[in-house]
Amino acid sequence: MNVILLDKIANLGNLGDQVAVKAGYARNYLLPQGKAVVANESNVKVFEARRAELEAKLAADLAAANQRAEKIAALEAVVIASKAGDEGKLFGSVGTRDIADAVTAAGVELAKAEVRLPLGALRTTGDFEVEVQLHTEVKAVVKVSVVAEA
């Protein structure tokens, strides 16, 4: 199925690209989320008419993500207290939701889907650097300090 992308999508293309994707991916993800439209003659004309508006929106989103990245870089280490054993092993773990909530409490809005933990949840006390992907082109690093509750 051929679609026109209305947003930059990682590993697929940029705004305005006409790409061939599997029908299920288009029907179940791209079309319902408004990230693409079916590539037919009428949609191509509508897209060309709205192209400047969509590019401006994309640029505004990128600028907002850059501002959030600067705020995150300015943050000091975010402290998360969790119950832990004697050797620093946590009872449970610190996941993406916990990190997102702690950063939001520190003053920078962050969704749990933006937090990247490639090695899984944090299961020990200590200091960690967690990558946050705010936009397809903007990444930031948050310093997270996991401490044992007293």
UniProtKB/Swiss-Prot annotation:
GO molecular function annotations of the record: rRNA binding; structural constituent of ribosome
One Gene Ontology cellular component: ribonucleoprotein complex
The keyword RNA-binding is assigned to this record: yes
Pfam entry (one): Ribosomal_L9_C
Family listed: Belongs to the bacterial ribosomal protein bL9 family.
Function: Binds to the 23S rRNA.
The name this protein goes by in its record: Large ribosomal subunit protein bL9
Organism encoding this protein: Shewanella sp. (strain ANA-3)
Lineage: Bacteria, Pseudomonadati, Pseudomonadota, Gammaproteobacteria, Alteromonadales
Gene: rplI
